[in-house]
Amino acid sequence: MRNWVVGGALIPRVGGVELDGLVLVGNRRRDRSVEWTPPGGVIDRGESIRQGLEREVLEETGLTVAAWADLRYSVVVEAPQLGWRLRVEAWEATDVVGEIVVADPDGIVEEVRQVASPEALVLLATSPQWVHIPVGDWLNGVVHPTGSFHFRIIGADRSTSRVERIA
């Protein structure tokens, strides 16, 4: 079973300017579709979540995170038939500076947008449930008592598998 740790950056303001929304990145997938998500990615061995997030935000957006609020929520996704388990921590960036520049060394991020909440919710609908449900709840001010979400993928083929929300 492969275990991944991923960080997600919730960026509601850049350079002290409130966006009434978020910074989102358009990720090109293998099937050529685009999924919109907050910036973030896999945390490298030896990095803390926030160190990895700072690196990912800079690589994907050109922005520098100087300060973080507390952890906003966590997500666990289990995919036993695919042989992996994913743990995500989503942190809110409170001090972000710089100019948006797409320079993703992985070549996945194709576009970065600062969007208001209504547009963010539309764009987030392109992402998996374990991304758009927690981010959408956060944007809408919904706070879950445990601060965590849990999903399971049933099936071994992406085109026919289904996602269940456990908690």
Predicted regions and their residues:
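Conserved Nudix-box catalytic region and its N-terminal flanking loop in Nudix hydrolases
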Residues: 19-59
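Short active-site-proximal "capping" loops at secondary-structure junctions
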Residues: 30-31, 73-77
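Conserved N-terminal beta-strand and adjoining loop/helix that marks the start
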Residues: 1-23, 42-45, 73
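Unchanged
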Residues: 43-67, 76-130, 166-167
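Nudix hydrolase/Nudix homology domain
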Residues: 33-34, 106-167
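A generic structural motif
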Residues: 12-14, 26-28, 78
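Short, well-ordered strand-loop elements centered on a beta-strand within folded domains, enriched
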Residues: 18-27, 99-103, 160-165
